[in-house]
């Protein structure tokens, strides 16, 4: 019998530079699915690949699929196992079921409760369905997951309140500028927070973003995801005047943006307002910058209370979401328990049909040879009943008294 197994590479453990090494690009995903599906013992598979996670879901006949899936991932991307081994998470059975539901509901996301992941999961499911790498078990698993996610969204407020500093930054910028899509944004840094800011700004329709970082390659990684421009940190001062929004989050030990730089930028901009958010500790922007007219400067302390309030709200909802997941998974596990019964029924049905066809052929030949119709039909009925009942009768005779009531339940015409 197949069992559910998951190999996960996600944001909780894995830096961007490793995640991108194991990502499946759209042009290679279908071939990757087919290759995985052709591995002996893999009955079905789905691959999810986003900027924050790569996950492989399989219905496998192997007792443990961790080594197999880890080797597949390394071989597919032509990388050594020791590069990724410490970043891999493996789940099977009920743990796999819980993990997938946590992913679908946003409980496992970088931003607690974010809804985008459900759409990404549905897309991965549909791709697997199109290339025929699904079976009944994975079909049922993902339909259960989507239903559970919908129930969580309907019955909790897990996605209602923004929780990340990045999200709050974007919401604050909307108060300054009515149309974010028309603004130019300068993002300074290339860490997790800047990546999230880029994500939310992109969702708001911002298509003019500049990512500046000391290591240009790290800036390019984020810029590539959102079709932004990437520059080195030494260059950013010449781009400041172009920015309507500046969000900075570096690891610099001293401020990198001073009052003089912003004064010059404002003159070039003819005092068009600049929204600035400093989410670095120590601060990246000199506090004196906030004294300038047409500058709206916020620090992480200004956002702290908003974020903490929303984290509290979502943490409460997280508990409710987990309760729903547990209850829904109990229903799914009951269905899993019936699979051996279904297989037994299918096997018995196949055997019964074989017996029926064999006896029917004999009866037809007898009728063609002139045998009496009524006698032939009666003989067919008797033989069919005897052959079909032989094995059940044998098993009933060998069944203990304690289990006899279960046998009676399978024979509705028994009279008490």
From Swiss-Prot:
InterPro entries reported in the protein's UniProt record: 4pyrrol_synth_GluRdtase, 4pyrrol_synth_GluRdtase_dimer, 4pyrrol_synth_GluRdtase_N, GluRdtase_CS, GluRdtase_dimer_dom_sf, GluRdtase_N_sf, NAD(P)-bd_dom_sf, Shikm_DH/Glu-tRNA_Rdtase
Annotated EC: 1.2.1.70
Residues at which NADP(+) binds: 189-194
Catalytic reaction list: (S)-4-amino-5-oxopentanoate + tRNA(Glu) + NADP(+) = L-glutamyl-tRNA(Glu) + NADPH + H(+)
Site residues (Important for activity), renumbered to this chain: 99
Active site: 51
Keyword DNA repair (UniProt): no
Enzyme class, UniProt record, top EC level: oxidoreductase
A biological process term (GO) from this entry: protoporphyrinogen IX biosynthetic process from glutamate
Binding residue positions for substrate: 50-53, 109, 114-116, 120
Pfam family, one: Shikimate_DH
Pathway it works in: Porphyrin-containing compound metabolism; protoporphyrin-IX biosynthesis; 5-aminolevulinate from L-glutamyl-tRNA(Glu): step 1/2
Gene Ontology molecular function terms on file: glutamyl-tRNA reductase activity; NADP binding
Record keywords: NADP, Oxidoreductase, Porphyrin biosynthesis
Subunit architecture: Homodimer.
Domain observations: Possesses an unusual extended V-shaped dimeric structure with each monomer consisting of three distinct domains arranged along a curved 'spinal' alpha-helix. The N-terminal catalytic domain specifically recognizes the glutamate moiety of the substrate. The second domain is the NADPH-binding domain, and the third C-terminal domain is responsible for dimerization.
Described function: Catalyzes the NADPH-dependent reduction of glutamyl-tRNA(Glu) to glutamate 1-semialdehyde (GSA).
Family affiliation: Belongs to the glutamyl-tRNA reductase family.
NCBIfam families, A to Z: hemA
Note in the entry: During catalysis, the active site Cys acts as a nucleophile attacking the alpha-carbonyl group of tRNA-bound glutamate with the formation of a thioester intermediate between enzyme and glutamate, and the concomitant release of tRNA(Glu). The thioester intermediate is finally reduced by direct hydride transfer from NADPH, to form the product GSA.
Identification of the protein by name: Glutamyl-tRNA reductase
Biological source species: Ruthia magnifica subsp. Calyptogena magnifica
Gene: hemA
């Amino acid at each position: 019998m197949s069992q559910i197994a998951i190999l996960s590479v996600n944001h909780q453990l894995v830096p961007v530079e490793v995640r991108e090494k194991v990502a499946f690009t759209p042009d290679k995903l279908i071939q990757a699915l087919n290759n995985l599906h052709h591995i002996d013992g893999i009955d079905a598979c789905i691959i999810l690949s986003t900027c924050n996670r790569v996950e492989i879901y399989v219905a496998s006949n192997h007792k443990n699929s961790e080594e197999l899936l880890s080797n597949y991932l390394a071989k597919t991307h032509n990388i050594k196992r020791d590069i990724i081994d410490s970043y891999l998470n493996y789940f099977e059975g009920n743990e796999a079921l819980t993990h997938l539901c946590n992913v679908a509901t946003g409980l496992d996301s970088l931003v607690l409760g974010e809804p985008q992941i459900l759409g990404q999961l549905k897309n991965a499911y549909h791709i697997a369905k199109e290339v025929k790498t699904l079976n009944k078990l994975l079909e049922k698993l993902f339909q259960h997951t989507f239903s559970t996610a919908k129930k969580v969204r309907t019955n909790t407020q897990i996605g209602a309140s923004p929780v990340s500093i990045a999200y709050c930054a974007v919401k604050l910028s909307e108060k300054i500028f009515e149309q974010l899509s028309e603004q130019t944004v300068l993002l300074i840094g290339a860490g997790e927070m800047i990546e999230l800011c880029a994500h939310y700004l992109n969702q708001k329709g911002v298509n003019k973003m500049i990512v500046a970082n000391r290591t240009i390659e790290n800036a390019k990684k984020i810029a590539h995801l959102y079709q932004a421009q990437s520059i080195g940190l030494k260059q950013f001062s010449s781009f400041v005047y172009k920015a309507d929004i500046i969000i900075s989050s570096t690891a610099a030990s001293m401020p990198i943006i001073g009052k003089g730089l912003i004064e010059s930028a404002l003159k070039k901009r003819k005092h068009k307002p600049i929204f600035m958010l400093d989410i670095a500790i120590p601060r990246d922007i000199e506090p004196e910058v906030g004294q300038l007219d047409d500058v709206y400067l916020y620090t992480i302390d200004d956002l702290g209370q908003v974020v903490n309030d929303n984290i509290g709200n979502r943490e409460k909802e997280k508990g409710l979401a987990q309760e729903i997941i547990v209850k829904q998974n109990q229903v799914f596990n009951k269905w899993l328990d019936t699979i051996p019964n279904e297989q037994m029924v299918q096997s018995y049905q196949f055997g019964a049909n074989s017996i029926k066809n064999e006896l029917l052929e004999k009866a037809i030949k007898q009728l063609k040879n002139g045998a009496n119709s009524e006698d032939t039909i009666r003989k067919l009925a008797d033989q069919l009943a005897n052959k079909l009942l032989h094995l059940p009768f044998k098993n009933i005779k060998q069944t203990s008294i304690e289990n006899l009531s279960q046998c009676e339940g399978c024979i509705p015409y028994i009279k008490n």
